[in-house]
């Protein structure tokens, strides 16, 4: 709810480590969800607050292992660098995915698709597991 998210942002702004969970399929979707909780007249201010205080977004999914022995973690990692912070501030959330792809080596970011490809090529998941991950993105597996 609005009051809880606002309180979390204020606490994070003062330098306190703050964790939250959201049911979203990507880092960009998580950021949008936080911003969209607020009335439109406050969203610009919230984008600024979020761009300054956000330290990371981890999106995760547990997928069936190829060997049938449990599950394996697929994850998207967003680490806000100056470019990401600027995209949040300027309400260009739709460009975050591309910035994450470009920031993989230098900043340690990883898109969900990159994680899926890694798991697949290491033999940890099958094509079927890739397509079960989330239905919103174009997956990289054959």
Describe the residue ranges of each PLM region:
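Short, flexible helix-loop junctions that flank or precede catalytic/ligand sites
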Residues: 1-142
